[in-house]
Amino acid sequence: MRGEGRNREFLIASPEIPLTIFSKMKFALLFLSCIPCFPISGAAGSQAGEKKPNIVFLLTDDQCTYSMGCYGNAEVKTPHLDALAGDGMVFDCHYVSTAICMASRANIMTGKFEFRHGCNFEHGALHGSHWASSYPILLKEEGYLTAMAGKIGFEVTQRPGKKGVLPVGDFDKWGAGPGQTSYRTARNKSMVAYAEKYPHSSRSYGAFGADFIAEAAKEKKPFCLSVSFKAPHKPATPDPLDDKIYAGRTFTRPKNFGREYGLHFARQSRQGRQFERFYGWNYADKYDQVMATYHQQVYAVDVAVGMIRAALEQYGVAENTVVIFTSDNGFLCGSHGYGSKVLPYEESSRVPLIIHDPRHSNSGKGLRCDSLTGNVDLMPTILELAGVDPPGGIDGRSILPLYGDPEGQIRESLPLVNVWGPAEVYSLAVVTSETKYIYWPWSGEGYEPVEELYDTEEDPLELENIAKGQQKQLLEKMRRTYDGFVDQWREKAVPYHHYRPFAVFFDRGVAWEDKVSVLEK
């Protein structure tokens, strides 16, 4: 498949994922999955008269695809995530529409692009009108028990421009916290009960999830558990319990690692802290040590995922619980000579996505899907699972048809937005399952606007910008797609937090002098 080739490009090692990776307790599920009880071939949403499924949504922070065995890295240990991949479906072409935590988490919750919900650092909190139609609220209204643990990543406000509050009262069980939260469980006020046994936050969230599952199973009501791990976000703070996992290990660098593989990138992309962090975060001279702590943090998440899945089995709800695992954005980890995230390149914007629906006949086959999906698609996916009609005005589309038909398609393109950081690095890109077009508008102080075009099917490492090559028809096609998203921005952006003027800034046909006036407002 195209996606498998895409992942093999990142590292030289690529493990074979078995068709099924069941524990001993999973054989009953295998039997159940063979029973022809699904009238729907493409989706497994809740239909009238059916028992509503439970939903477990697991979100990490800053996790790149090559931190997992099931995405092609045989040098890391992610047994529970690899088992989830074998039990469910892996999505190889899943992107975040904004590659920074606050906006991406709002994208996920609301099913809307950033310019539609208006929530990000330097802009503002999520407006209550958008939160009111988020998946946690809509599922609770549908009768679901809901729980939230970890880093929710944003606050909710009723007045644009004003500080918001955490939506504590909107969940039946709360284990989340403000801001970035802490790796020290004792510092997370809503999680202090777990601090003695689980002093590091990652395992504490696994324990929280297990406890909620036990409580919800007694209620005989469907539940939705959302767990948002801080890991593997900086500062690197691995759980000491796992210190031996990667002690003394070395790691294969991605084939696009280092500054020499980023010389063709737009000059604008080097003006943010992502460029500085290649050296500042020691990717250049201490790669093995840096990646050992990074992978160690992911390992603790993997343990927590195992705790949650074990609880589903223990309390007899596994066969009716859909598990979704993904990340809010990726991480560059030295690729092209950059660190951190935000930029529209693959390591930053393409993230893991695994979905396991044990009720579906396609489960247990280790299937992969290389159709384009986005983080905004997760909200309508969750709603369809629960049998809830999506509200109007969202940008996402349910992924469930792809679970039934991995060769299908739910969208042709997706915008990749950045309006955070220095204005020089503001960018808007559009991606398809095979191509990516990036536009860098900044033209001040000797700069010129830059176009980048990549064939991500043939060149997944983004080593050749073909915007000035022979692909004229492809370039024009991607320009038209890009212009269409600019038009959407102009028509649908929220009227606050300074989002509407960015439609002018990203318009390829507007003179720089007119864009400067927009930035100065």
Region spans (language model):
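Polar, surface-exposed loop/tail segments
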Residues: T78-P79, I108, E142, K151, ...
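C-terminal cap/loop subdomain of S1 sulfatases and analogous C-terminal strand-loop tails that border
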Residues: P160, D172-K173, P178, N329-S335, ...
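Active-site-proximal N-terminal segment of extracellular/periplasmic enzymes that hydrolyze or transfer
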Residues: A48-M89, Y95-T98, K140, L461-Q473
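Bacterial N-terminal signal peptides
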Residues: A28-P39
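Short, solvent-exposed turn/loop segments enriched in Gly/Ser/Thr/Pro and often Arg
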Residues: C70-E75, M89-K112, A125-L126, M148-G161, ...
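Active-site-proximal cap/lid insertion segments
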Residues: G49-E50, D62-E75, P178-R203, F212-T373, ...
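Loop/turn elements at helix/coil->beta-strand transitions in domains of secreted/extracellular proteins
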Residues: K51-I55, D87-D92, E142-A147, G169-D172, ...
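Catalytic-site neighborhoods of secreted/periplasmic enzymes
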Residues: N107-G206, P235-A236, N418
